């Protein structure tokens, strides 16, 4: 049990902007923009934003907004065309940025006014009471990076580099000593030329990346020499040139009203830079949040210490809950995962889906979206830390389309032009939703709206009940939340069958709750059922827990 600070619990809704509003149902494999169409920023009108907010959401992460490498030709608008050898898919990866100061033309109705459309979307999002999350991709850029929209006073990345040096702290890139880029492991017939080759984004400091490398990107240089005689050395004095340029990019977008940055592969960038950059950004914009994609639990506290507000809890909580859903671990294993980050729990971002992970409903994961509901109840209601969901999750999107570069892998593509039917139905053609999709949406809405409606769930104390209930620990997970006199009991059931259990409230929890025997009325927050409870030390409560769901009972204790 631990105490938490009073605050609004963030519920982040990730949208892949290019896909979200697309209503072109052609869905041709490897289809072009003209064939398959593309969602636009204007698709997020007030009505759509209100529907998203009504799910219980507080933040929207607009993924893929910054201009990135693409095989689509916008040269008639003065936008440089990207070579297809170094583009993944037709639409391209949103994490191969080719201009940090530009908005992707695909998602604009008026390409020449694409920045104006983004500014208008920020304004609309704020108008309905939601906050804006935007990508920041600090580790790498597209191979043909060249900014055409940077402010006049800004020098471009690589513009002043000395490419004869493999490493210099004042270079923005790493170079392969005059060797040309060799894409023979990627392309049948390479026509793209890069001399000298730049190091590839996933720390490949040689000129021949493989097809499994991030070959379409180049690594940014933050003052670390990865290839010196000792293996690695830091060169942070004087301040590396890249630090200034990347911090200027953050300040540029923060000035436009971006409320939070989701920082891609944050742990591939040195903590020294993050301490320097977050300090400068938060000095100017103290409310701006930094979300870190960090996968090494031993580094969590280091990244929090240098200014990150929230970090992905993937290797711990996500992996655990996924295993519980799939029957590979007992539900009681969840206890260990929150305990592992007990001292930093406010900073851990829980999720069940995002663009990198397989959809719950896909056969690669659970094969049934309903199996994610007990995990949703547990992860969303346990603690005051942020929770994130991915557009389409609330409708049971399976991610099983074969779109092109992405293939059929249980994930929704980030490389191709496509229409995601579950999102199209849920937001623009609701008459086409199935009863199962409507039912799942209502469950998500009911659970997520409780998060900030109930004080005990938003900011209350947490009490894990599993140590006193080891007899139910295989497929059920139970805990209490408490704020003042309000107590909420949550029990989730990962089993596909309804179960009857005897739940023990241990003496320590009883003393924390009230300390004296008392009769109370408990009300279900999911279906409004009521039941009488007599609370006493080491009490046992008979409960019936529905299949693939849970119970959430609220009790208001009397004054002593």
Enumerate the language-model features and the residues they cover.
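N-terminal structural segment of carbohydrate-active enzymes
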Residues: 1-131, 139-141, 146-150, 155-164, ...
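Active-site-proximal helices and loops of the catalytic beta/alpha 8
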Residues: 122, 140, 152-157, 168-181, ...
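C-terminal beta-sandwich/jelly-roll accessory domains of carbohydrate-active enzymes
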Residues: 496-560
